[in-house]
Each structure stands twice: as C-alpha cells, then as structure tokens.
Curated annotation (Swiss-Prot):
Record keywords, A-Z: Disulfide bond, Heme, Iron, Metal-binding, Oxygen transport, Secreted, Transport
Protein name stated in the entry: Globin, extracellular monomeric
Single annotated GO MF: oxygen binding
Organism in which the protein naturally occurs: Tubifex tubifex (Sludge worm)
Localization (cell): Secreted
InterPro entries: Erythrocruorin, Globin, Globin-like_sf, Globin/Proto, Haemoglobin_extracell, Mb-like_M
Keyword Signal belongs to the record: no
Binding sites annotated in the UniProt record for heme b: H94
GO CC term, one of those recorded: hemoglobin complex
Length: 141
C-alpha cells in the first residue's frame, strides 16, 4: 500500500538513517558490502565501476549515485506526480541493464537489515516493506 502515514515515516526515517556527508558513504559501504556478501553474483553487474573493490573511488561514486537516486525517490513520496515521474525514469534506466527481478528483493532485504543499525527500534518495518515494494515494483515490472 504505502499509505500517507507510511510515506511520512519512511521519508523521515530515511533522512535520519542516510544522514549527510561522509555518513552517507559509510551507509553505502555497509549496504553494498552486505549485498555482495549475501549475493556475490550481483557484484558482476558493477564491473564497469570497479565492483570488485567496494572501497575504490569509482565504486564509491557509483554507490552514492544509486543511493542518491533512492534518496530522491524517497524524498518525493509525498508528491505523487513527481514520484511517478522518478519511478518511470528509474525503470527506463534499469531496463537497459537487464537486472533480474530477484536482485531487487536482495536490495530491499539488505536495506531492511542495515536500517536498524541507524534507526534502532524506531524502524517501522511494515512501512518500509510496503513503500520499498511500491518503489521496486514500479522499477522492475
């Protein structure tokens, strides 16, 4: 569903978890290292950005771009027209890359596993699950 209250919670919890500046890099490294640990085959999607080394400047920059896209998408949760346009843009970007549907689930699961490290018991797991389902569903369907 990702109703108005869930969107509000996700938007505000994301701002707290993702933070600013160098904190974002740490968040990204934690997330991507978790993804690569649990689904090492995903690393192959990132060959052109030195995905074999999550600490390389090239991969860190790419990881920040990906999370920047998620940041923008989450920030638009309360503006349906802009949110829909962002999802359409992300869908076109991801269609070119032939990303398996399963990989979106891996991303969501790993993100949900990392968020408690930043939000603790404030994490609204249901709100995040619902809203991430809407986001990833629109991108890969």
């Amino acid at each position: 569903e990702c109703d108005a209250l869930q969107r509000f919670k996700v938007k505000h919890q994301w701002a707290e978890a993702f933070g600013t500046s160098h904190h974002r890099l740490d968040f990204g490294l934690k997330l991507w290292n978790s993804i690569f640990r649990d689904a090492p085959e995903i690393r192959g999607l990132f060959k052109r950005v030195d995905g074999d080394n999550a600490y390389s400047a090239e991969f860190e920059a790419h990881a920040e771009r990906v999370l920047g896209g998620l940041d923008m998408t989450i920030s638009l949760l309360d503006d349906q027209a802009a949110f829909d346009a962002q999802l359409a843009h992300l869908k076109s970007q991801h269609a070119e890359r032939n990303i398996k549907a399963d990989y979106y689930g891996v991303f969501v699961n790993e993100l949900l596993a990392v968020l408690p490290d930043y939000l603790g018991t404030k994490l609204d797991f249901k709100a995040w699950s619902e809203c991430l389902g809407v986001i990833t569903g629109a991108i890969h369907d």
